Amino acid sequence: MIKQVYARLDKSVSNARQLTGKPLTASEKILYSHLWGGKTDRPYERGNDYVDFAPDRIACQDATAQMALLQFMQAGKTKVAVPTTVHCDHLIQAKSGATVDLKSANSTSAEVFDFLESVSNKYGIGFWKPGAGIIHQVVLENYAFPGGMMIGTDSHTVNAGGLGMLAIGVGGADAVDVMADMPWELKFPKLIGV
């Protein structure tokens, strides 16, 4: 997948530069190289135009993944359209120490974890079991890469930006659309220079 992203990057950026008539920021390069359908015939106005994007990856945490996966199951698909992972970390309360807390969560949320694992296995979704790590750190260490675009059902999804990935937290419905091979609609973001 990473090779595919980099293979289309130069052409997408070149096309976007010609359309906009200006140099692009790193964020704009990522946005223009992840357009649904591959390219555009016009520049997009920041903060005004709604644009369809094709993210490279999705990450879901266990609390929000439940409804997202139930909705995906209704889509009639046999497999997710883009690499997707479920991370079991939010239903584990930190109270008494890792061993005790994990045992408690596995008991209290066993049905949820079993459901998530079963659905993940059925639809080709990566499953990170309870105790495997916190979603935003696992994503950073295993899936983030410069120039990529991902969405995640966790407010810390943006952590993947530390490696140059455009990573945005979304609701479960947005994640389901991308899992089901539909575009992800977003108002072309305003950019702040730092």
Feature-to-residue mapping (PLM):
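A short glycine/serine-rich beta->alpha loop
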Residues: 18-21, 57-59, 102, 144-156
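Mobile "lid/hinge" segments at catalytic clefts and subdomain interfaces of large enzymes
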Residues: 5, 62, 145-194
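Anion-binding (especially nucleotide phosphate/pyrophosphate-binding) glycine-rich loop
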Residues: 79-151
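Short, glycine-/Ser/Thr-/acidic-enriched flexible segments
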Residues: 37, 58-60, 91-93, 133-135, ...
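Gly-rich Lys/Arg/Thr-decorated short loops/hinges at beta-loop-alpha junctions or inter-strand turns
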Residues: 11-13, 52, 92-102, 120, ...
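N-terminal amphipathic, basic-rich helices that act as targeting or association modules
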Residues: 1-88
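Glycine-rich, acidic/polar active-site loops that bind/position phosphate-bearing ligands
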Residues: 63-72, 104-116, 184-186, 190-194
